A protein has these predicted regions:
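ABC-family ATPase nucleotide-binding domain "signature/switch" substructure
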Residues: 4-7, 14-22, 32-131
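Catalytic-loop signature of eukaryotic-like protein kinases
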Residues: 1
Length: 145
């Protein structure tokens, strides 16, 4: 978590992990917060890797946040936990999120819908659903039961 922020205190690292919803699984590791993680992420699930990355971003506290397909390879149950962490991370900062899973951007102040490299729609989630255009079609296709 402290990678890229070597002067962070242990308390700051733990606080970032708690805010990212990663603390619970970290303390269950044999090495806890002293666990060394290899390049491939070891035996962590995709969701756990995401939460660790979110904790790292929270610790560095960037003014602008760029997220690219942040929930693309996790299951829906884990996505809820990761989304809660993202909501915490994005609060009070400018965030650009590239997403195909529309649940990731549902709470955005402004959504730009792109197709073939062009912006074709713009608005909040509710505005785009009400417009009944491309975004609404995508949303219905993702959440059809």
């Amino acid at each position: 978590i402290a990678y890229g922020c070597p002067d962070a205190t242990r308390e700051q690292v733990i606080e970032a992990a708690k805010r990212a919803h990663a603390h619970k699984f970290i303390v269950q590791l044999p090495g806890g917060y002293d666990t060394v993680i290899g390049e491939d992420g070891g035996t962590f699930s995709q969701g756990q890797k995401q939460l660790l990355c979110i904790a790292r971003a929270m610790l560095t506290d960037p003014a602008i946040l760029l997220l690219d397909e942040a929930t693309s390879s996790i299951d829906t149950r884990t996505e809820l936990q990761v989304q809660a962490a993202f909501d915490e991370l994005m609060a009070g900062r400018t965030s650009f999120v590239v997403a195909h899973r529309l649940s990731t951007i549902r709470n955005a102040d402004c959504i730009l819908v792109m197709r073939d490299g062009q912006i074709i729609e713009r608005g909040t989630h509710d505005e785009l659903l009400a417009a009944d255009g491309f975004y609404a079609d995508l949303y219905r296709s993702q959440f059809a039961q």
